[in-house]
Amino acid sequence: MTFRWQTDWFQDCMPLFSCLLEEAERIAAGKTGDFGKMGDLLGEIENICDPVEELKNCHYAGQMMNVRSALLDLTQTDQKAELASYTLLPFLWELREEIYFWGCVAEDIEKRQVYWQEEFVSHHRRVNPRRIEQKKVTIFIPACNHLEYTKQCVESVLRHTDLRECELLLLDHGSKDETAAYFHTIPNAKVIRFRENVGMLMFSVAFRACCGQYLAFVSNDTIVTEGWLSHLLDCLEREENALSATPVTPFTSNCQGIAPCPLEGLDEFAKDFYEKRKGNWRHRARIMPVIGVYDVEKLDAMGFGDRWFQTMEFWDDDVSLRARRKGFRQFLCTDVYCHHFGSVTGGVAWGHTLAAGRELFLQKHGVDAWGQGFCRSEDMMALLPEMELPETSISFLAVDCGIGDSIFEVQNYLKEQGKQVQTYALSEVEGYRGDVFPFVQGWHTAVEGTAAALTNAFAERRFSLILTEKSGLSGEILAERLLPGGYVLAMDSELTKYLRLAGRKGHWSLWQKM
């Protein structure tokens, strides 16, 4: 692992961290560690870092407190090797990374971009010495206060999960109530205790600590239902290049939710929900995972949570973008229903941090997280069943559909109808290429403009369906690119002169070539 942007003071920290990590790894291996020496090393790091102005507005101080508290806990437990493995080592790795990123990288735009391109993944890989304890799934439940909700969540996981192949990590993320004491009553659970809440670092600690082939994140304001984990794993194991699988939950945006079911009938509702929709898995451009199961090997290839998103808003949009550009797919499993109370932990501060998180996303990626195509329209979805496409092989053209959620939902629908789909896409914005190209058979950047590109791109092809989120396109050109009987599904468009109106819903309309 390299640290390209080391300052003089950070170089002074590096040998101290090497000694700390060496001692921690000795303890994790079941050997005796020198706790006094480790405390002294932390003191030396504090002497170097405390005056650094760039570290005043990050989680350096909080994470230093977490490391010191973990060290104290180690002196008071008989389970030293285990605690060092899943708490002290991940805490130290995150402390070092917090100091490096905010102290040496974050202030400079060029350094940030190089860091994200060349260092982020290697700096966030899982480095876990507990190889003898491999499990299929690590389930992690973070909680910051709200013990009454946390108990319902944990009890539902214990009730509805076969834990013989699972590791259960319970993260007390700076709670001031009795959360930590409750967590310690759960048999066979591993409790990671943050004395200080350190935002996004919590996700990285959980990832570094896990020993499962899959990592299941369960928010403490949810209740899981019978079969939740096996059903989500079924999707991950069957779908090609699947990074994550997420259930339907109420009080969730991004067209991922439905109206809540009364808790008294939750289990029966979820069982019936699954039987009626079994295997209905929808590839989506972005996912908001109040519950999400991830393929750990793929997370290792792209990194998980990014500390850049200090407000904890848009971190999931960031993960989704990086997944798309790796060619990994995220699935909303519309056959799995779990309950969500609705951002019990995060809801209070949400209004204050949303705009800040969106700006951080723009600064990192140069595109708006809520830009064109970030979430498909319910009106568009309502028009899809109005199409009559008798052919089994569908040639599909997407025109200026941005991030691509509408593209993926049309693909989902056509595949549900038993169609073989060949998808082509064109856009005036080259920046969307990485979001869409891995999932289509052809891409064209319309540097000549969309109207001209509709004439020139994929010139040898005619299409059964054209989808466009760009208004004002020529109906004549669109009709020319259609096969007889083909459709245009368009937003804010009037194509009456050249095509027959087959349906209209809100801003969307469906047109057919006769």
Predicted segment positions?
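Short aromatic/hydrophobic "clamp" motif used to bind/position activated sugar donors
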Residues: 215
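Conserved donor NDP-sugar-binding/catalytic core segment of glycosyltransferases
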Residues: 226-261
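N-proximal low-complexity "stem/linker" segments adjacent to membrane-targeting elements
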Residues: 100-156
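Short, acidic, metal-binding catalytic loop of nucleotide-sugar glycosyltransferases
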Residues: 155-165, 413-416
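A conserved acidic beta->alpha catalytic loop
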Residues: 172-180, 402-403
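Conserved donor nucleotide-binding strand/loop of the catalytic core
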Residues: 180-199, 209
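A short, conserved alpha-helix in the catalytic core of glycosyltransferases
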Residues: 227-231, 285-303, 308-336
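A recurrent flexible, glycine/aromatic-enriched loop bordering the glycosyltransferase active site
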Residues: 200-201, 208, 251-252, 256, ...
